[in-house]
Amino acid sequence: DIQEFYFKRAMKVTRYEDEFCYYVRKPWGIPTTFGKEKSFLEYLFEWSEKSWSYPFISLLSKAFTKDEERGLLNRLDNATTWLLYFAKTPQIKQAYKDLQKQGRVYKYYLLEIWWDIGYWIKKYGNSIDFPIAHHKFQDDRMVVLLTSDLKSKIKWASHEVKTKIEDYSYDKQSNRAIVLVSIQKWIRHQIRSHFSSIGYPILGDAIYGKKKERYDGDLQLFSIGLRVGS
């Protein structure tokens, strides 16, 4: 099974831990958790009896139920890759939830975009804080409310979220920039739709990318870590 081989390979080289969490790399193109499609969590825990599995899988199965998502602390969009965090105990998961409610959890991502974001930062600052809502007619995308007339396209209420640009590096030759961002609150496709809405789409974005800018690779958006602030 080629899919099993792929996940087996990914797991062997990209799992580590500290005193609070296990950190596992989620591959591209698969849902994080249980839903309509088979998810990364299902593959991970279905194979817990395999000889190549790590002990942490069975430990999480004992500590958390399926409804508790086996201790999962964050979710990534299907097309986003790299770090998922799993709490080692229910107490750690609850402490994380409490910190998140207090706005003290900062999640960090690296992304690659078209063009020099420095121009936008000089004019508007380093935060993108337009509200985001689910699209009324297209289930696979979100709407960024740059103007009030876009409210006719939204389903349900909008979400007040902020994507903060922490740092960036622009390469003039390729006309691309590597950007480090942080978020606190999170809504589906937040970083992708925010950057596209201001004219700097992420490379490989099949939904929010610009068709005239050709890039055949996967979405260049990576979950790289988190920080607890004061």
Feature annotation, model-predicted:
Residues 1-230:
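RNA pseudouridine synthases
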